[in-house]
Amino acid sequence: MAIYDFGNIEKKWQERWQENKAFSIIERDRPKYYVLEMFPYPSGKIHMGHVRNYSIGDVVARFKRMKGYNVLHPMGWDSFGLPAENAAIKHGIHPDHWTKENVKEMKEQLDALGLSYDWDREVSTCTPEYYKWTQWLFLQFYHKGLAYKKESQVNWCPSCETVLANEQVVNGGCDRCDSSVGKKNLNQWYFKITDYAEALLEDIKLLDGWPEKVKTMQQNWIGKSHGAEIDFPIENTSKELKVFTTRPDTIYGATYMVLAPEHPYVMELVKETEYEEAVVAFRNKLQHMSDIERTSTEIEKEGIFIGKYCINPVSNEKIPIYIANYVLADYGTGAIMAVPAHDQRDLDFARKYDITVTPVIRPIDESDGFDIEKEAYTDSGIMINSEKFNGLDSEKAYEDIAKHIETLNAGKRTINYRLRDWLLSRQRYWGTPIPIIYCDDCGIVPVREEELPVKLPVDVTFSGKGSSPLETSEGFLNTNCPSCGKMAKRETDTMDTFVDSSWYFLRYTDANNEQLPFSKEAANYWVPVDQYIGGVEHAILHLLYSRFFTKVMKDLGLTDQPEPFKKLLTQGMVLKDGAKMSKSKGNVVSPEEIIQKYGADTARLFVLFAAPPERDLEWSDQGVEGSYRFLNRVWRLAEEFIDNNLFMSTSLGEALTKRDKDLKYTIHYTIKKVTSDVEDRFNFNTAISAVMELINELYKYKETDPSKLNGDLFREGIETSILLLAPFAPHFTEELWEKLGKAESVHMTNWPEYDHEAIIKDEVEIVMQVNGKVKDRMMVPTNVSKEELESLAMKNEKIIQIIEGKQIIKIIAVPKKLVNIVIK
């Protein structure tokens, strides 16, 4: 008997798949199925999270092929990003070389897992062949008015003299040199995603195949709220402070105004006043805090009075203007109408700085003991201290006061969104160059489409200091204006890498198109992606940006599809010792070591069997050993079957014994269960468990009475087990399938169909209970009636002994399940 030599088997089949381009065949006469895992950043090494993510997608792809679908299952590389640039600074390795070496290494590791990718469609976002079309799409956005430039704040390291991304700011310091990070105003490029806020929100209802958690996160991120925009005139100036509030009914209780310290009016209002020095110091203090820190519920709310007042437009009362650490300039209008009686944060601030608190809503039932001295009242109620609106229900007063504000020309009812425009400028080298030219005469001029791609230059200096490395390349920086022909300068910012990943799934549909990013025909055929798989950490940015891009491209006429992903699976993390695997924790398990010791199929089987895909998976060495033992058990059974010609024993043409029928039932019940588990629920763990039970039954069947073994039935059991395991353990099953004399690949073989008649049992086990406690079990005909079941129960010897001399209250009979006799 041949041993399970996984090393040679896996190498053999990987080479054969590659030679035959086994997964590149496209057959348009079949229904399409597009399965996609989020493409990785090429760090150089895959980790167990990758193994799990890609194994899940591969099971789906292989299953759908066997079910007769025309499957698209591509892979590529999200290959722009900071690590490559940091490697250039630290080790003097050019990002392009560093990235290509990592891609090569990771591709070999993915192939070693036996993943069924169509490598003919491979994309890498850092290649000119790809980023040409990213630039082309930017130009389409620009011409549509969706790409624009404005001044905004960025993180600035004074030591490195460079801009830092948010993820490079660690505890207020630079991740390179630990210097305190400040803020700096720069002109930056944005995408106008807010133009699509309503469409992005409204179409969440189309995402039936997405987890509710992810849909809720997107809804909250977009953050639609109804309210009023109100203008508060600043005393003794011609300026007004514009605020948005969801509670116009509380405007009479507004006793102070809070501005973000970075609000454009602040420095102008305090200029050459006694408050200027304190305001500057306060602003400088906040320079070293992230937006997340400033808005945290844990942080103490701090502020200072700036010496100015504004006028409440409905009461004409003067209210003081403060700046505070918890108000952000780019959220809302950067100004808040503070109503301390009805907002706990405002109340805490008012108490700290001794600001007036004016309740304008009281509880409907005044006997409920509510005390404004203890907490803010945030519910609806009866209006008070609100002039002509006193006595009204606050919910009705909401509309009345909003109308009153409009009558006074002091504001309007409106809808606000939490969503902000997408800042895409990065002062980096290793990203897609923004295809814009600056001319002293013509201003901002887009690069002509025929001149794309604007390629990244090689002659740059990676010092880690100053502005973008692109500014160090004279050949890149200096160019001619496309409009007037005079000398001009190129944009030296590159795009946020989320831009690259917002449309890659469309490029896969037509990856080698040199005329367009993709043809409309290909996009409409393949998109939406039928099943998208990736981590929940991408629930907002990547998924929202991809939805935005798809909607814009629909409006541009590039595709007819409004949404990119039909179904979404967010897989859980791989843990060890209860924590996410990381080098710092010393709990990393290397996929390469597992593959070398047990084989790729064992690694795949374990990560698919150990937990449902959407849950976290706890690594277990014993679990890996168990998966390896199971594959060896299947191997021995199949080898024994082949070596001993067991299938020659008898024929299915002969009458089946009860033992035969039981095995046939198990075979076809397993087909039904595995099909349902994989197709409908992605319950891969229970699917594998069902195959394990079938293997147990085949062993029992073989060993009980070998002389009366039905060879054809046993062969059916062996072949079914191999087919059902094929998506999970692809090399293993290919080898056994070939050993069984099959000419066609197991992965191109039709998925087995279960026989409805075979899973109808002649007999069923009934549980016998007395007063709800199990006393016996018995086999009865499947079609026995309720009355017959009661009669059989009353004739059961154990039951007769228990109920003798007792009063029978009632008999509960449930056909095919149980009989419960209630006595006293």
From Swiss-Prot:
Keywords: Aminoacyl-tRNA synthetase, ATP-binding, Cytoplasm, Ligase, Nucleotide-binding, Protein biosynthesis. GO terms for cellular component: cytosol. Its main location: cytoplasm. It catalyses: tRNA(Leu) + L-leucine + ATP = L-leucyl-tRNA(Leu) + AMP + diphosphate. It holds the Pfam family tRNA-synt_1. InterPro entries: aa-tRNA-synth_I_CS (IPR001412), aa-tRNA-synth_Ia (IPR002300), Leu-tRNA-ligase (IPR002302), Leu_tRNA-synth_edit (IPR025709), M/V/L/I-tRNA-synth_anticd-bd (IPR013155), Methionyl/Leucyl_tRNA_Synth (IPR015413), Rossmann-like_a/b/a_fold (IPR014729), tRNAsynth_Ia_anticodon-bd (IPR009080). A motif ('KMSKS' region) lies at residues 580-584. It comes from the Bacteria. GO terms for biological process: leucyl-tRNA aminoacylation. A motif ('HIGH' region) lies at residues 40-50. Its EC number is 6.1.1.4. ATP binds at residue 583. GO terms for molecular function: aminoacyl-tRNA deacylase activity; ATP binding; leucine-tRNA ligase activity. It is found in: Cytoplasm. Belongs to the class-I aminoacyl-tRNA synthetase family. This is Leucine--tRNA ligase. The gene is leuS.
